[in-house]
Amino acid sequence: MQIVHTPRELKEARIALKGSVGFVPTMGALHQGHLSLIEKSKEHNDYTIVSVFVNPTQFLPGEDFEKYPRRYEADKKICELAGVDILFMPQPDTIYSEDEVLVKAPHQKGYVLEGHFRPGHFDGVLQVVNKLFHIVLPTRAYFGKKDAQQLYLIQKMVQDFFMDIEIVPCEIVRDNDGLALSSRNVYLSDAERKKALLISKSLKRAAKMVQSGILDIQEIQKEMQNILQDLKVEYIAFVDRDFRPLQKIQIGKTIILVAAYVGSTRLIDNIWL
């Protein structure tokens, strides 16, 4: 595995790759969810590139940028064992410059839900992903469905900017107890982790209600709120695949999303129906 630290080094390494290239952008603290993306990339492509970069522009003031878990040596070992071809580990000053040309999230879809509670977050996400795409020039890029709104906005950016990149959505990976894997799960105490399971429990309950023929969103939302009453819920949302609000469940087109605080840790999860 080759490890590079600057865009120039990565571009030089990329030129030598003859064949399809899969790309898995991450913020590090790699877990089984990230590994599932890497495995998909290796399955689909001749080469796989992974980036580990805690992107400062997607954190709001007062968020956890400084304490976000950084495990660079462990991440290197994980990528090497997974068969990654190139690992890109840049510093912010190699990615960003002063007074940059900016990529902005669309107002209607980028400033609702996650974008409402974290205004400007998706500006930072799209800015860095756009840069990474231009450096890596991947054939395909892999993103988890857990960050569903991010996935949608990246797909839209690729479409709107006529990028010749296939975005591959990948299923949410969960622990045996149902908790969606997240690098932020390390913040949870044992008691908080048990509470966090209420999020996936509420989504499973919603899915069962839909399977039983209940399509009324208010009824499903009320049931979910009852399950989540011990958490500080920011939103429970029902949207279609293009992140338009729904008035009624549409089978095969619905995403139910939850964002909630468990103690001081903010978690998100969703289910695609």
UniProtKB/Swiss-Prot annotation:
ATP binds at residues 27-34, 144-147, 173, 181-184. Belongs to the pantothenate synthetase family. It comes from Nitratiruptor sp. (strain SB155-2). One of its GO terms (biological process) is pantothenate biosynthetic process. (R)-pantoate binds at residues 58, 150. Beta-alanine binds at residue 58. It catalyses: (R)-pantoate + beta-alanine + ATP = (R)-pantothenate + AMP + diphosphate + H(+). Homodimer. Disulfide bonds: none annotated. This is Pantothenate synthetase.
